Amino acid sequence: MALKERIGTVVSDKMDKTVVVAVINRYPHPTYKKIVSKTTRYKAHDPENSCAMGDRVKIKETRPLSAHKRWAIEEILNKTIKNKEDKK
């Protein structure tokens, strides 16, 4: 069985060693053929707490780590730059 991989954006980093990654899946509607976007949120394991909100990451499927965590951060593709003005 091949491991699944997804690319998404970190939308929450408030938990310890866990981030929430939003993955956008685009597909044609079965009847109307219009392109529809569906956002799925995955809780992913981040052991070093290295991800921040807005980072673009690649996640991979893993064994169940908790009740809701079945994904782990494989690599950070794009880091976001935080300014001092954003904290105000």
Curated annotation (Swiss-Prot):
PROSITE patterns the record matches: RIBOSOMAL_S17 (PS00056)
Cellular component aspect of the GO annotation: cytosolic small ribosomal subunit
Biological process (GO), any one: translation
Keywords of this entry: Ribonucleoprotein, Ribosomal protein, RNA-binding, rRNA-binding
Nucleus found in the keyword field: no
Gene Ontology MF, one: structural constituent of ribosome
Pfam families xrefs: Ribosomal_S17
InterPro entries: NA-bd_OB-fold, Ribosomal_uS17, Ribosomal_uS17_bact/chlr, Ribosomal_uS17_CS
Keyword Ribosomal protein carried by entry: yes
Function: One of the primary rRNA binding proteins, it binds specifically to the 5'-end of 16S ribosomal RNA.
Quaternary structure annotation from Swiss-Prot or TrEMBL: Part of the 30S ribosomal subunit.
Family membership: Belongs to the universal ribosomal protein uS17 family.
The protein's name in its UniProt record: Small ribosomal subunit protein uS17
Organism: Prochlorococcus marinus (strain MIT 9515)
Gene: rpsQ
